Amino acid sequence: MKIGVFVPIGNNGWLISTHAPQYMPTFELNKAIVQKAEHYHFDFALSMIKLRGFGGKTEFWDHNLESFTLMAGLAAVTSRIQIYATAATLTLPPAIVARMAATIDSISGGRFGVNLVTGWQKPEYEQMGIWPGDDYFSRRYDYLTEYVQVLRDLWGTGKSDFKGDFFTMNDCRVSPQPSVPMKVICAGQSDAGMAFSAQYADFNFCFGKGVNTPTAFAPTAARMKQAAEQTGRDVGSYVLFMVIADETDDAARAKWEHYKAGADEEALSWLTEQSQKDTRSGTDTNVRQMADPTSAVNINMGTLVGSYASVARMLDEVASVPGAEGVLLTFDDFLSGIETFGERIQPLMQCRAHLPALTQEVA
């Protein structure tokens, strides 16, 4: 099973709590995180894109770097780890994304890929005057389908004459082309999102579910597997989890309860409000899971809370789910979290037993 890190491109990472570590996103922080992840044989690093935050006491995600420029910088200071940036497709024409991706492919030596998102938080785009109207909620995967067809044309042949409802290419050119086939990823959990991933993505991200229920996402992975079978493609699921670990289960649980006790209710209210804006995509979208009150303090990503041995065991359970090819991890404290993962958790994981021994060099 592959392991990735979801780098904190926005302030405070993924904990919406006054009791969680409070920090600003910087290149130096993310550089240290990704270099440490590479040292511990993580397979990939991904950054999201967020253009407006949730506010509240913690000013959650009000402060964000930009994904492509951040990952270009990280590509230049790493040598093995796969690097993924996220394109907010309403803000960037596909021909520009194609050229930026080809550039980072050159910087990274073929280690770059693109995560495509349609956009769900209306204020991100309204503030720039580019929200296409609420009908977009029901047509966003039609838009993304045209978008990725233009990308594939340009990366594959260097030229596109695509004509569609959303994009018109007239002998559009991109050169140089990427040195290796460019990987495209998506994070669809709705039926439309999974159908898109089944047709066009190399793999699909999904949320883990619950606290210490590592296989609860299995029905989602099964839906993705079934959708991919309809297209004759192999599209695995990569599952998002937060790791909160300590020497003992009780110590880890105490940290988790402390974070929940400091939940930033004002920021969480904003998230809930935004989740109700899309009345057209059904009930199975990512944002509806994010806003569920069960564990909203970390946007309801799957959460693994326990001793190092307990977390290792739960991650091995994740690996046992059919269709689960990887996990994307966040941590309550990224630098110490990656180090303890690499030193104390990963060596106990059966699904990572193939890794070579660590060098003595300090990450």
Curated annotation (Swiss-Prot):
Q: Which InterPro entries match?
A: Luciferase-like_dom, Luciferase-like_sf, Pyrimidine_monooxygenase_RutA, SsuD_RutA_monooxygenase
Q: What induces it?
A: Up-regulated by the nitrogen regulatory protein C (NtrC also called GlnG) and repressed by RutR.
A single BP term in Gene Ontology: uracil catabolic process
Binding-site residues, FMN: 49-50, 115, 124, 140-141, 190
* Flavoprotein is among the record's keywords: yes
Note the superkingdom of the native organism. Answer: Bacteria
What chemistry does it catalyse, as a reaction equation?
uracil + FMNH2 + NADH + O2 = (Z)-3-ureidoacrylate + FMN + NAD(+) + H2O + H(+); thymine + FMNH2 + NADH + O2 = (Z)-2-methylureidoacrylate + FMN + NAD(+) + H2O + H(+)
Keyword annotations from UniProtKB, A to Z: Flavoprotein, FMN, Monooxygenase, NADP, Oxidoreductase
Task: Name the NCBIfam families for this protein.
Answer: RutA
Protein name, per record: Pyrimidine monooxygenase RutA
What's the source species' lineage?
Bacteria, Pseudomonadati, Pseudomonadota, Gammaproteobacteria, Enterobacterales
